[in-house]
A protein has these predicted regions:
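Structural helix-boundary/capping segments
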Residues: 4-24, 70-125
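Serine-dependent amide/ester hydrolase catalytic core
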Residues: 4-70, 119-124
Length: 125
């Protein structure tokens, strides 16, 4: 038996405590708002076909999506512009079991913007 196996229960309990704190923070936020918006990633999309060689950097690209996943909340990403001809995304997070709010917001957003129609230069339309 390795040390990790001996502490599995303690790690699991601690992870559940952290998850509960994250969920509580979202519950507090949703008492004042219908949706929460964040960037989807820290920057623009990667070049097509490129793979990051640094797993930590790849993990950090998902940083903004982790909290919604841990809290069990619905979330989606919408096109929200571009940087150097590479798309950037807007993440919309909804309250627990409230997918209609993020879908309605996404529809409203796309009727007011045209980012969903953007095709990067060099891509087929």
């Amino acid at each position: 038996m390795c040390i990790r196996d001996r502490y599995y229960d303690a790690y699991y309990k601690k992870a559940q405590q952290v998850r509960r704190l994250i969920k509580n923070d979202f519950d507090n936020a949703f008492s004042n708002v219908d949706v929460i918006m964040t960037p989807t990633t820290r920057g623009a999309a990667f070049e097509i076909g490129s793979k990051g060689s640094d797993p930590i950097q790849m993990y950090l690209e998902d940083l903004f999506t982790i909290s919604a996943n841990l809290a069990g909340l619905p979330a989606m990403s919408l096109p929200n512009g571009n940087i150097d001809n590479k798309p950037i995304g807007l993440q919309i997070i909804g309250n627990f079991l409230d997918e209609p709010s993020i879908l309605n917001f996404a529809h409203m957003y796309q009727t007011k913007t045209d980012w969903h129609l953007y095709t990067p230069e060099g891509m087929k339309k």
